[in-house]
Amino acid sequence: MSPRASRAVQEAARRIVRDRDGHRCQMCGASLVDQPSSIHHRRRRGMGGSALLERASNLVRLCGTGTTGCHGFVESQRTLATVRGWLLGFLDDPETTPLQCFDGWHTLDDEGGRHPFAGEVPA
């Protein structure tokens, strides 16, 4: 098992995500200014303490908490969330697995890039 990411690595990745996603829920597009929001792990933290889980490509800002808003939707509608790229399996690579955002399908990289995905997406 890989070691846990240090606090500095976690904060750096979260800073990248906040800069990339701004004040907008990446699922519904709602403004997150003065609204509850959270940073969602596409590949769940419960899958081990790997430092890979704190990569910016694995993290995305959503409205709500794990039980409310879009974050709650992802946690309660796991099959649909998986089809749309919001939840990943243990072997899925967050950098190459697209997700359906409010403005189309995108891939995310670890440097803060958000790239339109032109490949085949699930129906």
Question: Residues of each region from the PLM?
Answer:
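Arg/Lys-rich, low-complexity, intrinsically disordered N-terminal tails that contact nucleic acids
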Residues: 1-13, 117-123
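Residue-level marker of regulatory loop/turn positions in helix-turn-helix DNA-binding domains and
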Residues: 6-10, 17, 52-55
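Short cysteine-rich loop/turn motifs with clustered Cys
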Residues: 10-38, 61-66
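Short Cys/His-centered divalent metal-binding micro-motifs
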Residues: 30-33, 56-83
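Histidine-centered divalent metal-coordination motifs
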Residues: 40-41, 71
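Short cysteine/histidine-rich metal-coordination sites, predominantly Zn2+-binding motifs
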Residues: 41-47, 80-90
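Short linker/helix segments within small regulatory modules
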Residues: 43-59
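Short flanking/linker segments adjacent to small metal-binding domains or redox-active Cys/His motifs
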Residues: 86-123
